[in-house]
A protein has these predicted regions:
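Hydrophobic pocket/interface hotspot
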Residues: 8-11, 23-24, 31, 44, ...
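A beta-strand edge to alpha-helix "cap/lid" segment located at domain peripheries
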Residues: 3, 49-121
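A short gly/proline-enriched turn/hairpin at secondary-structure junctions
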Residues: 32-42, 54-58, 114
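Short, low-complexity N-terminal intrinsically disordered segments enriched in polar/charged residues
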Residues: 1-29, 119-121
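Generic recognition of short, well-ordered alpha-helical interface segments
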Residues: 3-6, 18, 43, 47, ...
Length: 121
């Protein structure tokens, strides 16, 4: 799990820095990525690039990992502090969310969003 956690820590740092190319390089070519704005999923690196381009044109999201754990099927579960502002700096969201990552060949293959463990405890 440690190697995957280290990769994900970098992914969060790169996302928050808007270094899209580095984040996308950590993803499998055929990644399935949760669309937290519009629902459903986007597919492939190009789908994620398009989604983030739309997202970052309207909001300024930042996500900070708080806790990492391993799920029953080997997935990495991350409890995340999510802070979202509009482009004028107005706070839109400040909450905990759950992120679930599945890896293939050392790359992120799937990303899903769920309630954080603290919300269900």
């Amino acid at each position: 799990m440690l190697d995957k956690v280290e990769v994900l820590k970098k992914v969060y740092d790169w996302f928050n820095a808007r270094d899209m190319d580095r984040v996308l390089a950590a993803m499998h070519e055929d990644v399935v990525w949760a669309n937290g704005m519009e629902g459903g999923h986007v597919y492939g690196r190009n789908g994620v690039r398009s989604y983030w381009t739309r997202q970052w044109a309207t909001i300024d999201p930042h996500v900070y990992p708080v806790e990492f754990s391993t799920g029953p099927e080997g997935e990495i579960v991350v409890e995340v502090h999510q802070v979202v502002h509009d482009l004028h700096g107005k706070l839109l969201a400040d909450k905990m969310v759950g992120h679930v990552f599945r890896f293939e060949d050392g790359l992120v293959k799937r990303f899903d969003i769920r309630e954080p463990a603290s919300a269900t405890a």
